[in-house]
Amino acid sequence: MSGIIATYLIHDDSHNLEKKAEQIALGLTIGSWTHLPHLLQEQLKQHKGNVIHVEELAEHEHTNSYLRKKVKRGIIKIEYPLLNFSPDLPAILTTTFGKLSLDGEVKLIDLTFSDELKKHFPGPKFGIDGIRNLLQVHDRPLLMSIFKGMIGRNIGYLKTQLRDQAIGGVDIVKDDEILFENALTPLTKRIVSGKEVLQSVYETYGHKTLYAVNVTGRTFDLKENAKRAVQAGADILLFNVFAYGLDVLQSLAEDDEIPVPIMAHPAVSGAYSASKLYGISSPLLLGKLLRYAGADFSLFPSPYGSVALEKEEALAISKYLTEDDVFFKKSFSVPSAGIHPGFVPFIIRDFGKDVVINAGGGIHGHPNGAQGGGKAFRTAIDATLQNKPLHEVDDINLHSALQIWGNPSHEVKL
């Protein structure tokens, strides 16, 4: 294979999956085939999309009800020649799912890149090992928290929040994705003030915390804004990838003047991936493509919290982010939304130690504030790695957290 193989879930009311697959393969490449003169067929053969797999799935009543017609469901795979497109994500996505995405009854499940094609993508600049080296933390999951309620607040409020989270043992603190450039907490001021706070905490407590600052603005201003952030001392860039595009992420990741990790936020991605019947699958969008394009971290809804993905999907995202690939470093999985200390054993059981445990309200909502919330999570992480049930741990911060949010993991075994 020298090109790319696209895997689709299709729904066909004509009940002929093979014909539907061939129509897609032709429609996204040379347009027609059977009516072409033999000589022209020979000339265009190398550009033709080829159906390489058709698999019928069981009938699904919910799907029929939603589509208001009886359809045949199937998985098909089509190989697209590398000759047909330039080796970039806009060309790849347009080739494999451009006008087909308007069908409304087709879901792009996966894209399998040839080795030749993979060479054109940067992958994570730091990856899991590089991030761990920055923090000098190698034996446990990382803990991340989020600034909460920052809109309309000043730098003093940010510094207080940041200090409390760092003292609580949080490894990474990230901006809220809806915190943009503003007069009260402008980008460079956030970074400079944040570094002062984190250096003070490190000198006093010996704990290192990194700050992920949200890089925003118009698309053609992003590189300049990212470089300003780097010059001001940014540790990590948070980026709302799907508000801009995967190719924009790749452009930032490939720039040698932006030598910091990039954290991909999934904002807007639900518009592409939420439906089970059409769009682009979450594992492909939030896993494989983000990793290929250069994300060191990928945030996605956890299977446990307030905006839950199905467990199978969440684990598939993580698999794409962390599976061995000679071309790419591994990206950190960051299952998010509604996470509290009682979920820690689930997260470690399902995602392993190479995961970032990300919490907002589960840290800030603690009775002892963000310091207590961070300490509760760190205690839960340590206890889980020792295979000790959380309810048996004698720690006031963890006990308070379990009292508030519960302990659904009391029977979890690693």
Swiss-Prot record:
Keyword Isomerase: yes
Name recorded for this polypeptide: 2,3-diketo-5-methylthiopentyl-1-phosphate enolase
Positions that bind Mg(2+): 174, 176-177
Modification type N6-carboxylysine: residues: 174
Molecular function GO terms recorded: 2,3-diketo-5-methylthiopentyl-1-phosphate enolase activity; magnesium ion binding; ribulose-bisphosphate carboxylase activity
Single GO biological process annotation from the record: L-methionine salvage from methylthioadenosine
SUPFAM superfamilies: RuBisCo, C-terminal domain, RuBisCO, large subunit, small (N-terminal) domain
Residues given in the record as substrate binding sites: 148, 174-177, 265, 338, 360-361
Catalytic activity: 5-methylsulfanyl-2,3-dioxopentyl phosphate = 2-hydroxy-5-methylsulfanyl-3-oxopent-1-enyl phosphate
Keywords: Amino-acid biosynthesis, Isomerase, Magnesium, Metal-binding, Methionine biosynthesis
Cofactor: Mg(2+)
Enzyme's top EC category: isomerase
Pathway, per record: Amino-acid biosynthesis; L-methionine biosynthesis via salvage pathway; L-methionine from S-methyl-5-thio-alpha-D-ribose 1-phosphate: step 3/6
Lineage, broadest ranks: Bacteria, Bacillati, Bacillota, Bacilli, Bacillales
Enzyme Commission code: 5.3.2.5
Annotated family: Belongs to the RuBisCO large chain family. Type IV subfamily.
